[in-house]
Amino acid sequence: MGCPAYENEITQKPFLNPYVYHPLFVHLSEKEKQKWEKLQRKIRPLVFTIEKLKKQHKPYQKEKKVLDNLYEKRAEIVKNAEEKMAVLDGLLDSMDPDSIQDTLLFTSNVQMDGCMQMLAEKKITRAKITEEISASKTDRETGLTERQEILKGFAAHSLQVVLGIKCMDEGIDITTARVAIILASSTNPREYIQRVGRVIRPAPGKQMSEIYDFIVLGDQDLPLLKNEEKRVALIAQNADNYMDVYQLFKGKGVDLNEYQQEN
């Protein structure tokens, strides 16, 4: 995967807290499919053009910049698929107060406010850590930064769920976290391994860790699952329920063992 230092987070099984991996499948709406297909129609010829320029040893930086922008727009459609919120709603309803405790919820900027409102309606105590939540501003009375106050409340169980975006990927140590809900994922191995690593690090008294991963499925014309396979294989490989996950994906035409052989 190219990130061995981060892969150790979830491949060195003797040093992991036992965990169960739960893939949660969602689909794009018809409107989202149309947007995705429209971007694909722009991406395909551009990829061809760039490959042609490379072979001719001609500059292609301008085309590459346009292509990267299209890839980013396509990823945003998948990241913010509308059905994710409905599936999250059902997941939260299925979790009792004990099982929702010690949960990290990874969202996108677009999803953050909706998630906060959903948790509030379900009377789940929560706080969000964003780039705007200062890591340096100190409270005059406690001497703690805003982030430190949130993490203190999380460790003390006065907060059940902490929500975060990319700022949760580095520099924050939350050893008490046991559950990860990955609503918005990343295609960057370093980022998604760090997110999983937040909840599978061992800690005294920590019970089985749980990872809920939202995966967008396509159809014959939208092979979206292909983009997720390596990530799923890497996260699932040391899960206590690996064979169940393997069979689940096998039924969708994906052999996760192929990726085990690569790693």
Model feature map: region roles:
Residues 1, 16-21, 123-125, 175-179, ...:
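Short glycine-/polar-rich loops that comprise or flank the Walker A/P-loop
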Residues 1-101:
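Interdomain helical connector at the RecA1-RecA2 junction of SF1/SF2 helicase-like NTPases
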Residues 35, 191-195, 227-231:
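Alpha-helical scaffold elements adjacent to nucleotide-binding pockets in ATP/GTP-utilizing enzyme cores
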Residues 102-106, 112-170:
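Conserved helicase ATPase core of P-loop NTP-dependent helicases/translocases
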Residues 108, 131, 185, 214-216:
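Cofactor-binding loop segments of dinucleotide-utilizing enzymes, especially the Rossmann-like FAD-
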Residues 160-186, 191-194, 208-214:
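A short beta-strand element within the Helicase C-terminal
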Residues 198-228:
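Conserved segment of the helicase C-terminal RecA-like domain
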Residues 222-263:
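Long, largely alpha-helical accessory region at the distal end of helicase-like NTP-driven motors
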